[in-house]
Amino acid sequence: MHALQAKILDPRIGNEFPLPAYATVGSAGLDLRAMLKEDTVLEPGQTLLIPTGLSIYIGDPGLAALILPRSGLGHKHGIVLGNLVGLIDSDYQGELMVSCWNRGQTAFNIAVGERIAQLVLVPVVQAHFELVEAFDESQRGAGGFGHSGSH
């Protein structure tokens, strides 16, 4: 398991609400909580930038973090991430913020401390461009957008 430096920016974390933790041995994501000043209603079509009260520093350029939606919120209530996926670079040190979007038809109450997203660490491979005049042939070539077949 990798060590991840974290700073608690909201004193309610560690007191009223636990630090992010893996729910099971097989969990890939750490739950992030809505550290709002008060419960907030997210109206249909509305987006809101929600503080998590936590900052992290990954430090290792071979890693990054992704902020991903919690499946139950999207499926049951239409609450998804406004930017679909949040990418946290290894050298970022600011507060983790979650953009929530209500794509549903009804208002949704976000309670203080509610688990709203999850943080997943992923490996990163940095590449450089090697400029060429032509590519070696591949089976697919430049075909895209359904080129490989139908359902």
Curated annotation (Swiss-Prot):
This protein's pathway: Pyrimidine metabolism; dUMP biosynthesis; dUMP from dCTP (dUTP route): step 2/2
Catalysed conversion reaction: dUTP + H2O = dUMP + diphosphate + H(+)
A Pfam family: dUTPase
Extent of the signal sequence: none
Top-level EC class as recorded in UniProt: hydrolase
Keyword line: Hydrolase, Magnesium, Metal-binding, Nucleotide metabolism
GO molecular function, one term: dUTP diphosphatase activity
InterPro entries in the record: dUTPase (IPR008181), dUTPase-like (IPR029054), dUTPase-like_sf (IPR036157), dUTPase_trimeric (IPR033704)
Biological-process GO terms, alphabetical: dUMP biosynthetic process; dUTP catabolic process
Residues annotated as binding substrate: R70, S71, G72, N83, L87, I88, D89, M97
Cofactor(s) needed by this chain: Mg(2+)
Protein EC: 3.6.1.23
HAMAP family given in the database record: dUTPase_bact (MF_00116)
Family membership: Belongs to the dUTPase family.
Function: This enzyme is involved in nucleotide metabolism: it produces dUMP, the immediate precursor of thymidine nucleotides and it decreases the intracellular concentration of dUTP so that uracil cannot be incorporated into DNA.
NCBIfam families registered for this protein in UniProt: dut, PRK00601.1
Stated name of the protein: Deoxyuridine 5'-triphosphate nucleotidohydrolase
Gene name as annotated: dut
